[in-house]
Structure formats: structure tokens, C-alpha cells
Amino acid sequence: MNQTLLSSFGTPFERVENALAALREGRGVMVLDDEDRENEGDMIFPAETMTVEQMALTIRHGSGIVCLCITEDRRKQLDLPMMVENNTSAYGTGFTVTIEAAEGVTTGVSAADRITTVRAAIADGAKPSDLNRPGHVFPLRAQAGGVLTRGGHTEATIDLMTLAGFKPAGVLCELTNDDGTMARAPECIEFANKHNMALVTIEDLVAYRQAHERKAS
């Protein structure tokens, strides 16, 4: 990732710390991956605190595929089958079947309905019957080990939520341009600045976690 482009957001470690602070303050974070991977920016929010307004922003400026990143334990708790048995997608993204809250929603499409679905899925005592399938929220199962195992937005979301002190569950959506093309780093940076979001790269998060785990050992 071009560090000159990112310099206004601080050093790699500062970017991670600023992202954690933003999440704790109820703000969103823009997460970029490498140019040689998806080369995309995802808006992420804590599943516990994301507001209807933030969901509306995400739907308006994102791909429309609003994803809920969860752990394997949560997937099992909710009895969510993986979307396919044989995942042949380029990066092995861990989609499960889609979901809708069983109660408290209308069509499930609105920002408010999607927030209701997210909250139902992450509730402490959530059970399979709390969700209908299919729906308009796309759960993503993160790999154990986070970004140190798989350098994806799903794992980055779970790692950031955990480091920020939230449940390991977060909402993500890819940022798109007004013409429908995918937003790249310059557009993601502009969007983050405009909407008071922190910005961090998956590479930053990998280095941060490796450094902290070396200290711990």
C-alpha cells in the first residue's frame, strides 16, 4: 500500500490505535487491503453499536451487500450452514446462508430492519429460531487466528472489534463510487475524511498484532 497516500492518517501503529479509538467512540473505520489482493476499502462498524444512520450510510455508499462478520462459535450457535460446501471464490470468503430477524422487521431491506437483524444475531442468548433464512444480511465466518491466518476484511473486522473491547462481531460493506465501480485507495481516503472515519490497512493490523504478540511472549 502506498504509504504516502496514507500518511495523513499517521504511522501504521497510529492508524490501528486511531481505528480502535474511533470504534470505541461509535465511529466507523475504513479498512483497506493490498493493491494486489481485492484492492478495496470496506466500511466497518461494531455490530453492538452501529446506528440506523450508519447503516443507511453504508447502504447508500456501499455495494449493497451488508455483511455481518462472526466467529465460528457464533455460526454454530446460530446453526448457520455455509452458503456452499465447496467454496471456489477467489479469496475463500466465508459466506453463510443469509439471514433476517424473525421478529421486529417488515421486508428486512431497510436500514432499521438490517440493524434489527444484526442485533438479533449477536445477542448473548441468540438461538437459531431468532433468525429466518434467507434474508438481507450476509454473515461472514472469520477464520480462527484473524489476520495472522487470513488477511481478509472479515478477519480484520473481528480483530479490530476484539482489540477495541467489543464482541467479536462487526458489520462491513465495500465502498463503491457513484458510478458503481469499486472505490480504490484515493476514493476511500476521501470518503473516510469526509465522514470522520478512521482508516487502517490490513497490513497495519498484521504488523500491530505481530508486535503485540511478540511482546506478550
Swiss-Prot record:
Family: Belongs to the DHBP synthase family.
Cell compartment(s), UniProt: Cell membrane
Cofactor comment: Binds 2 divalent metal cations per subunit. Magnesium or manganese.
Domain of life: Bacteria
Protein's organism: Escherichia coli (strain K12)
Protein name: 3,4-dihydroxy-2-butanone 4-phosphate synthase
InterPro entries: DHBP_synth_RibB-like_a/b_dom, DHBP_synthase_RibB
Keywords: Cell membrane, Lyase, Magnesium, Manganese, Membrane, Metal-binding, Riboflavin biosynthesis, Stress response
Cofactor: Mg(2+); Mn(2+)
Effect listed in the UniProt record for changing residue 42 to S: Loss of activity
